């Protein structure tokens, strides 16, 4: 089904002749904003219903328009609307198809409305829905990490700084770090949603309208919290779009971090984890390969998310009030960013929840004892030694261990005593990783009780979210 494109576009009513084909080719946006058809139709239905309630259009005409727009929405969803470049954008496609269905009554629809406040509303409705979709995907991701964390409360491994073994932590504590990250991401999406959920309709092109619109009624019909307060700002404001893409970009950066760890941990060199075959790929040449593409794609998608954000900010930079056609270019990053995040989050969630973590290999990586050097320093601090002095003494022990080719855990009590007079026989207890964790029970620390408390807190939080 194709809307009639022979009629002169409404935006050229005061212009002579037809637009140059080169301008038309440059101006076409339907390939991008066509994805906004549902939001555009929803806004139009709320607008025309308000016009009827205000006595601006006949109620019977408004009812016909609302019913016909339901049909147009169904045709878009079924792929029956063929995009016509001559009609430029989604708004014109909807309006032309509406005209075919209800005739001249379609002309009532645009009373008191401009493309400028119309598209601003469409984007806000999209952003609200996108925030909900991203939040749901990140919640699924949190649940995947939480399930593995619960299964690995007693699994210990080296924690890393600078990708060097640093101190022992539990795998549960490590996985809960990602639950925290994605929790902050969800908070950001909630904040973006709250700021986006207001209606700009009634702002017109830039200066409102003389018609007696009920802006609050439209907002209420759309489930929005209120209306904008400055018409110039309302038609040119894309802050919520930028905030959405920032939230997507930061969540994608967090996904890239677990992506990198999946890549590292599944190497033979680390051997900490094995991906399910369902979340790995092979090689077209090397038959033995099992590649962690899910992690690599998560890393790569972060670059795309960052690019979307920078692209939008560059479009917005330096625009004078109010609306400028530059804003047409916001659709591609805005519409693609949230979808990419949801796809990536769901794939990573599947990879994490089906991965096998190798506890014995992780604990083996702690065997040499250097990850417990800080415990030896704090042993001295517990005995009244200033930390810097203790740090220096253990540093000398570490250097001696390296020269001798013996792990720190294998040094004798007598050897430890040569590095500081306060070292006694029980210093060797410092090199028990599980004992070390049991001594780290501050809130947020990796001690078993602290980790169990965090598991319970997140299980309660996500349980409430599910209800």
Curated annotation (Swiss-Prot):
Keyword annotations from UniProtKB, A to Z: Amino-acid biosynthesis, Arginine biosynthesis, Cytoplasm, Lyase
Region forming the signal peptide: none
Subcellular compartments: Cytoplasm
GO biological process: arginine biosynthetic process via ornithine; L-arginine biosynthetic process
EC number: 4.3.2.1
SUPFAM superfamilies for the chain: L-aspartase-like
UniProt cross-references to InterPro entries, sorted A to Z: Arg_succ_lyase_C (IPR029419), Argininosuccinate_lyase (IPR009049), Fumarase/histidase_N (IPR024083), Fumarate_lyase_CS (IPR020557), Fumarate_lyase_fam (IPR000362), Fumarate_lyase_N (IPR022761), L-Aspartase-like (IPR008948)
Functional pathway: Amino-acid biosynthesis; L-arginine biosynthesis; L-arginine from L-ornithine and carbamoyl phosphate: step 3/3
UniProt-listed Pfam families: ASL_C2 (PF14698), Lyase_1 (PF00206)
GO molecular function: argininosuccinate lyase activity
Any one GO CC term of the record: cytosol
Catalyzed reactions: 2-(N(omega)-L-arginino)succinate = fumarate + L-arginine
Family of the protein in this entry: Belongs to the lyase 1 family. Argininosuccinate lyase subfamily.
The name this protein goes by in its record: Argininosuccinate lyase
Originating species: Anaeromyxobacter dehalogenans (strain 2CP-1 / ATCC BAA-258)
Native organism taxonomy: Bacteria, Pseudomonadati, Myxococcota, Myxococcia, Myxococcales
């Amino acid at each position: 089904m194709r809307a009639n494109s022979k009629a002169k576009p409404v935006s050229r009513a005061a212009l002579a002749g037809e637009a140059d084909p080169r301008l038309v080719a440059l101006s076409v946006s339907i390939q991008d904003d066509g994805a906004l058809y549902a939001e555009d139709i929803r806004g139009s239905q709320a607008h025309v219903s308000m016009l009827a309630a205000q006595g601006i259009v006949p109620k019977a005409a408004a009812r016909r328009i609302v019913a016909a727009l339901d049909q147009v929405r169904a045709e878009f969803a079924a792929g029956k609307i063929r995009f016509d470049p001559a009609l430029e954008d989604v708004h014109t496609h909807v309006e032309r198809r509406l005209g075919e269905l209800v005739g001249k009554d379609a002309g009532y629809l645009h009373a008191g409305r401009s493309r400028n406040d119309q598209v601003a509303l469409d984007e806000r409705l999209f952003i609200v829905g996108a925030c909900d979709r991203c939040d749901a995907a990140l919640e699924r991701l949190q649940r995947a990490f939480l399930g593995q964390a619960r299964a690995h409360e007693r699994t210990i491994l080296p924690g890393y700084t600078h990708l060097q073994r640093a101190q022992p932590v539990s795998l549960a504590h490590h996985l809960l770090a990602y639950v925290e990250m994605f929790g902050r991401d969800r908070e950001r999406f909630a904040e973006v949603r709250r700021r986006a959920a207001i209606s700009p309709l009634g702002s017109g092109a830039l200066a409102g309208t003389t018609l007696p619109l009920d802006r609050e009624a439209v907002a209420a019909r759309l489930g929005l919290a209120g209306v904008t307060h400055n018409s110039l700002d309302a038609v040119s404001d894309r802050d919520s779009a930028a905030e959405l893409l920032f939230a997507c970009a930061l969540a994608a950066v967090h996904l890239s971090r677990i992506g990198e760890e999946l890549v590292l941990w599944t190497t033979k060199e680390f051997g900490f984890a094995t991906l399910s075959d369902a979340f790995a790929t092979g090689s077209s040449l090397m038959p033995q390969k099992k590649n962690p593409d899910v992690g690599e794609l998560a890393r790569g998608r972060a670059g795309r998310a960052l690019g979307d954000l920078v692209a939008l900010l560059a479009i917005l930079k330096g625009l004078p009030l109010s609306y400028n056609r530059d804003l047409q270019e916001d659709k591609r990053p805005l519409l693609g960013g949230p979808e990419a995040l949801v796809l990536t989050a769901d794939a990573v969630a599947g990879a994490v929840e089906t991965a096998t973590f190798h506890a014995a290999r992780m604990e083996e990586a702690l065997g040499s004892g250097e990850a417990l050097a800080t415990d030896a320093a704090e042993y001295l601090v517990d005995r009244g030694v200033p930390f810097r002095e203790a740090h220096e003494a253990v540093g000398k022990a570490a250097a001696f261990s390296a020269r001798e080719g013996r792990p720190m855990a294998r040094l004798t009590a007598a050897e430890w005593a040569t590095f500081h007079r306060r070292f006694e026989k029980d210093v060797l207890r410092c090199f028990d990783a599980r004992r070390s964790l049991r001594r780290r029970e501050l809130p947020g620390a990796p001690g078993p009780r602290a980790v169990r408390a965090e598991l319970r807190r997140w299980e309660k939080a996500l349980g409430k979210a599910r209800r």
